[in-house]
UniProtKB/Swiss-Prot annotation:
Its EC number is 1.1.1.25. This is Shikimate dehydrogenase (NADP(+)). InterPro entries: Aminoacid_DH-like_N_sf, NAD(P)-bd_dom_sf, Shikimate_DH, Shikimate_DH-bd_N, Shikimate_DH_fam, Shikm_DH/Glu-tRNA_Rdtase. GO terms for cellular component: cytosol. NADP(+) binds at residues 125-129, 212, 235. It catalyses: shikimate + NADP(+) = 3-dehydroshikimate + NADPH + H(+). Pathway: Metabolic intermediate biosynthesis; chorismate biosynthesis; chorismate from D-erythrose 4-phosphate and phosphoenolpyruvate: step 4/7. Shikimate binds at residues 14-16, 61, 86, 101, 214. GO terms for biological process: amino acid biosynthetic process; aromatic amino acid family biosynthetic process; chorismate biosynthetic process; shikimate metabolic process. Homodimer. Involved in the biosynthesis of the chorismate, which leads to the biosynthesis of aromatic amino acids. Catalyzes the reversible NADPH linked reduction of 3-dehydroshikimate (DHSA) to yield shikimate (SA). The keyword Transcription does not apply. Keywords: Amino-acid biosynthesis, Aromatic amino acid biosynthesis, NADP, Oxidoreductase.
Length: 271
């Protein structure tokens, strides 16, 4: 039996086991997916512990996505650029780090038939969640990428390695029509379901609204967007997509789209 798992500090409500167990079942993989709650006292020994336990692959969540990078032998190009690893592969005694949030975001937009190349994207929020999204948009040849944050100067210092523009929320109110608006802030996430990062006036200026929040599935931001005729994309498929990509890395397989859809539909019932 192959051993896999999720590494983090507080893991009680993780949906990851459901994603991975479905992939195991559909691909006849004799696998076990565990939750590994790691105290901060042991954060410097994560990779060695995985090797000792015989773990083949692991997902990594907060607060260890950055901390684990120094412990890895090889880090993928996207994880280096993003500055965070959320997937580890142990193979032939070596450890490899990837960022599958990057791929999960791409899978989410591809499924929703949102074209990136040649279009403009405005990203709300300058937290860690924005990094994989900005990198994917950059690599996919978006015409214009704008990071919107409360502190423009602070955001510039934090994201200066990206080929993007910067804007404050006040400046966002004055823009003309653009293509897509992406929320990477926790606004609208349960239990704060009535919060939204931008006004309806701003939302109306876009054709597409994307929210990486998935609890609730339809946030207030997406509800406002839908009511104003925008195409809307919820964040649940990004979660599914990043998990599926991890499985493809660990097991050298290509997961069928039917499996991805089944996982999405099963998880959708939870919200």
């Amino acid at each position: 039996m192959k051993l896999f798992g999720l590494i983090g500090e507080k893991l009680g409500h993780s949906l990851s086991p459901e994603i991975h167990n479905k992939v195991f079942k559909d691909n006849n993989i004799d696998g076990l997916y565990n939750l590994f709650s790691v105290k901060k006292d042991f954060e410097n020994n994560i990779v060695e512990s995985l090797k000792c336990l015989g773990v083949k692959g692991a997902n990594v969540t907060i607060p260890y996505k950055e901390k684990v990078m120094d412990q890895l032998d090889i880090i993928s190009h996207e994880a280096k650029a993003i500055g965070a690893v959320n997937t580890i592969l142990i193979k032939d005694g070596k450890s490899y780090g990837y960022n599958t949030d990057y791929y999960g975001f791409g899978k989410m937009l591809e499924r929703a038939k949102v074209n990136i190349e040649g279009n403009s994207f405005f990203v709300l929020g300058a937290g860690g969640a924005a990094r994989s999204i900005l990198k994917y948009l950059e690599d996919s040849k978006a015409k214009k990428i704008v990071l919107v944050s409360r502190d423009r100067e602070k955001a510039f210092k934090k994201f200066k390695d990206f080929n993007i523009n910067f804007m404050s929320y006040g400046e966002l109110e004055e823009i003309n029509e653009e293509f897509a608006l992406i929320n990477t802030t926790p606004c609208g996430m349960y239990p704060n379901i009535n919060s939204v990062a931008v006004s309806e006036k701003v939302i109306k200026k876009f054709k597409v609204a994307v929210d990486i929040v998935y609890n609730p599935l339809e946030t207030k931001f997406l509800k406002m967007a839908k009511d104003n005729g925008l195409k809307t994309v919820d964040g649940l498929f990004m979660l599914v997509g990043q998990g599926v990509k991890a499985e493809e890395i660990w097991n050298g397989i290509k997961v069928d789209k039917s499996t991805e859809e089944d996982i999405y539909e099963e998880l959708k019932c939870r919200f």
